[in-house]
Amino acid sequence: MTIATERYSRSQANFAAAQAVIPGGVNSPVRAFRGVGGSPIFFERGQGAHIWDVDGNRYIDYVLSWGPLLLGHAHPAVVNAIATQAQRGTSFGAPTELETDLARLVLDLVPSIEQIRFVNSGTEATMSALRLARAATGRRLIVKFNGCYHGHADMLLVQAGSGVATLGLPDSPGVPPTVAADTITIEYNDLDAAADLFARRGSEIAAVIVEPIAANMGFVLPKPGFLSGLRELTQQHGAIFILDEVMTGFRVAPGGAQALWNLDPDLTCLGKVIGGGLPVGAYAGKRHLMQLVAPAGPMYQAGTLSGNPLAMIAGLTTLRTAFTDDNTAFQRAVTLTTRLANGLRELGERYRIPLQVGNVGTMFGCYFLRHADAQITNYVEAKANADTQRYARFFWAMADRGIYLAPSQFEAGFVSTAHTDADIDQTLTAVEEAFAQL
C-alpha cells in the first residue's frame, strides 16, 4: 500500500507532536488509523458535506463526526443557535426551558419514550440505563452481543466493537474479572442462543442491551425476528429490554430503528444526533422505570454539565430542522444514501470485488469480503470474512481522491442533509477509479 505522504505532510507533523502529549496521539483509539495504516488526517474546518485538512485538502465527508452531524458541518441554523445561547450563558448547573423543549420533541418523535434524562455521552447513557435496569429488577446479570459497542463502561467492554474491534482486543485490561463476570455475551443474530441462556438463567438477568443495527462491527443488519424475539424473551422473564440507539436514533428514521421496525423497548439510549455535534447522551423509556431515577426515585445518577444549554439548543435546532416539512430534507438524504449503496454494489459486481453493502435510512456500511461466497451476520464472521487489508488500500485510494470514509472497516458511514447528487456522483467516480486499481 502506497500513501501519498506529501499530500498529508502537515497531518503527519501534527500527529508526531500530538504523540508527545496525548496517549497514542489521539483522544479516541479509532482515530489513530490503526485499521488502515499510516498517520491520521488532521482536520481544521468543515462546511456542509465537506471538510478540509491541515494540508488544505478538501473531502466529501461520510464520517460526520461518527454520526452526530445529520445536517452536515456548521449548519447556519445550528451555528447561530449555539452562538446566541453562548452569549446568554454556556452552563448554569440548573434547569432550563431548553431541556424540557428537547425532551418533549424526543417524546413526540419516539413513541416508546415516556420520560428522558439527558447526560453527556453515549457511555453515560448506557451505563445509567444498565444501573436502572438492575435497580428495577434487583438482578445483576447483563446480556450483550459480541461486537456490539455500548461505550467504555467496565461492564460493557467485553467482546466490544468500534475501536476495540479495530485494535483486535477481546476486552480491556483494568476491567475487574468480577465485573466482567456479570456480563454475558452471545453472538449477534443468534436468537436460539439467547433463548437457551434465558431458559437456564432467566431469573438472574437484569437486562439485554443491543444495537438494532450492529454498526460498531461494520454494518450488520438484524435477521428477521431477532430483535422482536429478544423483546419477547425479556418480557417472558421479567428482564429489561434496552435498545441502544445512540447511533441509529434519528439516523435510520425520525423515530429511530424502533419506529422503523415496530419495537417497544423498556429503555432507549440516545446520543450523537440529539446533541447536534456537541457532547450529549440520554437514557429514556417507560415512566414507571424512569421514576426510579433520582430525585424522583432511589437510583442515583447526576452530571455537572448534563442538559447544558449549548447541547440542548444544538440538538433542538438539529431535530427541528431535519424533521419539518414532512421530513423532506431527511428523506432526500435517505434517497442519496440508497443511491450511494446501490452504486457501491453495482461497481463491486462490475470489478468483481466481493462486497457486502448495507444501508438503512442515512446510514450505510461496506465490507470487503475475503471470498465471494462469504457473509457477515455476526462478530465471528466479521473477523473471519472481512478483508481489512483491501479496505485499507481502498480507504487511502478514496482519501487521495477527496473522499473521507471511516478509517476502519468495522465502522458505519453516514450521509447528511447537506450532501447532494453531485457529491454522490463524485464519490462513485472515485470508487470506480479506486476499484480499478485494487
UniProtKB/Swiss-Prot annotation:
Its main location: cytoplasm. Its cofactor is pyridoxal 5'-phosphate. One of its GO terms (biological process) is chlorophyll biosynthetic process. CDD domains: OAT_like (cd00610). Its EC number is 5.4.3.8. It is found in: Cytoplasm. One of its GO terms (molecular function) is transaminase activity. PROSITE patterns: AA_TRANSFER_CLASS_3. Pfam families: Aminotran_3. Keywords: Chlorophyll biosynthesis, Cytoplasm, Isomerase, Porphyrin biosynthesis, Pyridoxal phosphate. Pathway: Porphyrin-containing compound metabolism; protoporphyrin-IX biosynthesis; 5-aminolevulinate from L-glutamyl-tRNA(Glu): step 2/2; Porphyrin-containing compound metabolism; chlorophyll biosynthesis. It catalyses: (S)-4-amino-5-oxopentanoate = 5-aminolevulinate. It comes from the Bacteria. GO terms for cellular component: cytoplasm. Coiled coil: none annotated. The modification N6-(pyridoxal phosphate)lysine is found at residue 272. InterPro entries: 4pyrrol_synth_GluAld_NH2Trfase (IPR004639), Aminotrans_3 (IPR005814), Aminotrans_3_PPA_site (IPR049704), PyrdxlP-dep_Trfase (IPR015424), PyrdxlP-dep_Trfase_major (IPR015421), PyrdxlP-dep_Trfase_small (IPR015422). Homodimer. Belongs to the class-III pyridoxal-phosphate-dependent aminotransferase family. HemL subfamily. This is Glutamate-1-semialdehyde 2,1-aminomutase. The lineage of its organism: Bacteria, Bacillati, Chloroflexota, Chloroflexia, Chloroflexales.
